[in-house]
Curated annotation (Swiss-Prot):
SUPFAM superfamilies, alphabetized: F1F0 ATP synthase subunit C
Site, Reversibly protonated during proton transport: residue positions: E99
Membrane topology type: Multi-pass membrane protein
Record key words, sorted: CF(0), Hydrogen ion transport, Ion transport, Lipid-binding, Membrane, Methylation, Mitochondrion, Transit peptide, Transmembrane, Transmembrane helix, Transport
GO cellular component: mitochondrial membrane; proton-transporting ATP synthase complex; proton-transporting two-sector ATPase complex, proton-transporting domain
Subcellular location: Mitochondrion membrane
Subunit structure: Subunit of the F-type ATPase which has 2 components, CF(1) - the catalytic core - and CF(0) - the membrane proton channel.
Membrane-traversing stretches: 57-77, 92-112
Name of the protein: ATP synthase c subunit
UniProt organism field: Caenorhabditis elegans
Post-translational modification: Trimethylated by ATPSCKMT at Lys-84. Methylation may be required for proper incorporation of the C subunit into the ATP synthase complex and mitochondrial respiration.
Length: 116
């Protein structure tokens, strides 16, 4: 909203001229690119960095989930050592699911940074 005030409204005067429609639209796009200010680009890049940072917060949740899984494995093994193999297979499954969600969050952060 604030960035719109910084851009000069040249498109109205270009569209009001009597030039052919294709030429007017081309000039309107060019005028929009010319009137973009440095402040608008800075705001866009700041929003991109904030979004990428917010997307990678999920990696911390993944780390906490992995800690919970292996903490529960140790407690379960201490209570019943005969179920070692079954508990370990469940722990590996929980680790894989938690790690996959963390990798999705990290991938989205990189996509926001480098693909947009």
């Amino acid at each position: 909203m604030y960035c719109q005030r910084l851009a000069l409204p040249l498109t109205r005067s270009l569209l009001a001229s009597r030039a052919p429609l294709a030429l007017r639209m081309e000039n309107a796009v060019a005028a929009r690119m010319i009137s973009t200010t440095v402040a608008r680009k800075d705001i866009d890049s700041a929003a991109k960095y904030i979004g990428a940072g917010a997307a990678t917060v999920g990696v911390a949740g993944s780390g906490a989930g992995i800690g919970n899984v292996f903490g529960a494995l140790v407690i379960g093994y201490a209570r019943n050592p005969s179920l070692k193999q079954q508990l370990f297979s469940y722990a590996i499954l929980g680790f894989a699911l938690s790690e996959a969600m963390g990798l999705f969050c990290l991938t989205m952060g990189f996509m926001i940074l480098f693909a947009l």
